[in-house]
C-alpha cells in the first residue's frame, strides 16, 4: 500500500487508515461526482457501513434530507430512532404515497402534465410492454394528464393532486378506442388488487428521513413500485433543491441490482444518477452482486463513474473488483481476508485501506446491526 490520507474539512469519520492508524475524514459533497457504490459479500458489513454514514450525515447536516429504498426491512430501527418515516409498501399496506404528487416550480414554470408525462409513459410501458405502446399513445396520455391536472392548476396549486385512479378514469372517459385500451391495462393498478399507488399520500412525506420498505412487495407489483418510488424521489430531489439549494439530499438504494434487473427502472435510475449532482443530491448503490452489475451496461457505467466506492470483503467477485479499480496484489489480499467493517475506500483518486470496528456493547451497534440476537 502507498500511504495516502483523507482529511476533508467538515467531513465525517469513515474509520481509521489501516496503514497509518489516522482517522479517515471525508465528505462526498467535496467530490466532482459524489455518488457512491458500496460492494461486499454477504456479512461483509455493507449495511453497517451505510447506516453509520446515514447516522453521521443526519446528525452533522440538520437540513439535509434522506431517502432509503429498503428491500429487506433493515433500516426501520434506525429511521424510527431518528424520528423518520417508514413507508411500508405492499398490496394491502395502509400507507400510501402518490407518484402523481406535484409541487409547482415558479422558476421553471413547467406544468404538471408535462413534468409527469415521461413517468406515466414509462408506467404504461411497464404494464403493457414496450412493444405494445403505439406512436399515438403519448398524445392520448398527455391529453388525459392535462385533464386530471386542470383542477390543480386552476386552484393555483391548492387543490389535491390527482392519482393514478383519476388517470384511469380520464383515459376511460375519452371517446377513442385506444384510450380505453390503455385504461383497461391500468385498471388493476387503479381500482383492482394492485392499487397501492392509486391513493392520495397519507404519510408524512415532509419528514427529512424517509424509508421505503418494500420487503413485502409481491413480484407482480414490484416493477411498478420501483418506477413509482424513483419518480417520487426524483420529484422530491428537485423540490428540495428549490426550497433550500444549500441542503443536500442523500438517496440510498440497497440491493440496487433489483432495480437494475428491469430495463425501465435501470434507465430511470441511470438518468437520475447522472443528474442528481445538478440538484445537490447524492445517490448510493449498495450490492453484494458485483458480477451482476458488471455484466449490466448501466450498472457498469454507474460503478465505473462513482468517485466514492467502498469495497468491503470480497470472495467470488474479487478478480472483477481488482480489474475494475486497478487494485494491487496487497489490496486484493486485504479484501479477501477482510473482517466485517474492513475494506478499501476509493475517494477520488485515493485508495485507502480502512477498518471501522464498532463496539458491540453500545446502543448504536444494536441499532445498526442486522445479525440475529444482536438487535434491540
Where would I find each of the regions flagged by the language model?
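A short beta-strand-to-loop transition that corresponds to the Sensor-1 phosphate-sensing loop
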Residues: 72, 286-290, 313-315
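Post-Walker A helix-loop "phosphate-sensing" segment adjacent to the P-loop in P-loop NTPases
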Residues: 56-67, 236
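Hydrophobic anchor at the beta1->P-loop junction of P-loop NTPases
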Residues: 38
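Hydrophobic positions on the alpha1 helix immediately C-terminal to the Walker A/P-loop
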Residues: 49
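P-loop NTPase motor domains
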Residues: 1-24, 29, 73-85, 89-281, ...
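Conserved lysine of the Walker
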Residues: 46
